[in-house]
UniProtKB/Swiss-Prot annotation:
Family matches, as Pfam families: P_proprotein (PF01483), Peptidase_S8 (PF00082), S8_pro-domain (PF16470)
Protein name: Proprotein convertase subtilisin/kexin type 4
Gene name tied to this protein: Pcsk4
Propeptide: 27-110
EC nos: 3.4.21.-
Occurrences of domain Peptidase S8 (ranges): 123-437
SUPFAM superfamilies associated with the record: Galactose-binding domain-like (SSF49785), Protease propeptides/inhibitors (SSF54897), Subtilisin-like (SSF52743)
Localization annotation: Cytoplasmic vesicle, Secretory vesicle, Acrosome membrane
Gene3D superfamilies the record matches: Galactose-binding domain-like, Peptidase S8, pro-domain, Peptidase S8/S53 domain
Superkingdom of this protein's organism: Eukaryota
Subunit structure, as described in the record: The proPCSK4 form interacts with HSPA5; the interaction takes place at the endoplasmic reticulum.
GO biological process: acrosome reaction; binding of sperm to zona pellucida; fertilization; protein processing; reproductive process; sperm capacitation
Signal peptide range: 1-26
Amino acid sequence: MRPSQTELWLGLTLTLALLAVRWASAQAPIYVSSWAVRVTKGYQEAERLARKFGFVNLGQIFPDDQYFHLRHRGVAQQSLTPHWGHRLRLKKDPKVRWFEQQTLRRRVKRSLVVPTDPWFSKQWYMNKEIQQDLNILKAWNQGLTGRGVVISILDDGIEKDHPDLWANYDPLASYDFNDYDPDPQPRYTPNDENRHGTRCAGEVSATANNGFCGAGVAFNARIGGVRMLDGAITDIVEAQSLSLQPQHIHIYSASWGPEDDGRTVDGPGLLTQEAFRRGVTKGRQGLGTLFIWASGNGGLHYDNCNCDGYTNSIHTLSVGSTTRQGRVPWYSEACASTFTTTFSSGVVTDPQIVTTDLHHQCTDKHTGTSASAPLAAGMIALALEANPLLTWRDLQHLVVRASRPAQLQAEDWRINGVGRQVSHHYGYGLLDAGLLVDLARVWLPTKPQKKCAIRVVHTPTPILPRMLVPKNVTACSDGSRRRLIRSLEHVQVQLSLSYSRRGDLEIFLTSPMGTRSTLVAIRPLDISGQGYNNWIFMSTHYWDEDPQGLWTLGLENKGYYFNTGTLYYYTLLLYGTAEDMTARPQAPQVTSRARACVQRDTEGLCQESHSPLSILAGLCLISSQQWWWLYSHPQQPVTEGQASCHPPVTPAAAA
């Protein structure tokens, strides 16, 4: 019997209602039974609070006595509405400085699924099989293999007993924040969905010359893994992962982020932002932790990594991808926050990255920007071995200088105000490990970071179809009129605006030296009418430029003719240093202290000198105090010595 018209209408109405609920639940925050709470008097106060309101105190979020992780067993594990009762109770307690009920955060691994390709027995991206590779062999031939450096892979766990990983595995650099135990071993499933972290780990630190798989870029570095993507992901989980053992771990590598769907605008929560800040200010005994991030795989959806608050943070070093042929991969996101590029693959016939895989296996199928970030992390480990005193900002300066346009193909290569080529696809180009370690050895410490905030718009202003907002910057100086910033590093634009179709709005910024950087290009799939709420865009394209002069923000409607919007707030944020960085040599230089070197190699690098710690301008130095003394007394003579700094080694000898 055919259903009546009324039954059809009822069925259709019910279906639409269910779809609406599903859509709403996908868009709305999902609250969980965990709270982050900041109290005034540490652990005892957190315990009192937990007992008073029926929480379980799961301990500190950061290694101090302020932020705590509380869970309530009487609250639903997942809900579309916050628990207002506990919210009111915590709000009324005078000892609670801040609290937040946690929500699930959608994070995706930045790998790609491709059909089976033939096995590639050679690692073409670092063994000179192609003319312009990552120049890893040059660093290895100088005896640099990552020894003494610790890297942690923040992902879905690593197979710690893998034949190519166990010798370098570091339990202190590992933890499981999904199950809260010390074992980061991945959860095995029929389709091996949790292979991502193990693959990233092998790129960095797979053991060399053991007759298995290939060699990691830094094959003597210690490697750890944090299991944090295989379960409920909250701000607490992310913050704790990024704060694990900050005095032990030198580099955190992350190949994940918000969805690369061309619609999402999302970034770290308050706790994760605090974890980044603490990492760069307190990590590595104050030198600053290195956070290496994959730029994203949303190219097919015209996504832009400046809509990802992890890759566009000033505290992370964002890495893009190129193919063996030097082309832009189909998944690559073009954005102004990318620093540098390493290899991955493009179409399915392209050679991919060789690395470790689950079940004690090897693979030649690792790809996406997920594969690019760990290669960069390994190269930075080589630089840290060459010079352990480098700060997080030193490394960013070095990466800018050690990246080469090489053979990379793109239509948007431009020369910025200080003569460097830069691209939204590749940043400053393909990272060169040999050049990176050469520069690291002779790098003088970067002077302190300065910040200049200029509020440009603070009253509602209608957005025209094409709108330019000029601002002449002359006030980046202190009370004595000394210039705070002479050379730029990061430039941020903080915006609050409404727009009828967000993805149709292109935003760009032009510097006083004429460099135009696209902060966000059109995103056709982003039909949101929410605009940008206090969102921060970032560009690396003005590195070392002089900030003084006319800055111009541009907003242009690239889509529907009748789009309308309002600009509520615009602040220009300039970061940099008082030093004129353009006066520094752009390549390694041998100074007048060259006589302190006892023996040099064929390339003129010092091999025999005063101490096994590091070389500065062709000279080995014993301590950070000696480093700073030489920096302050450049004309003083130095006594010669005879100890070896970095004797050359082959991978076979160093394995």
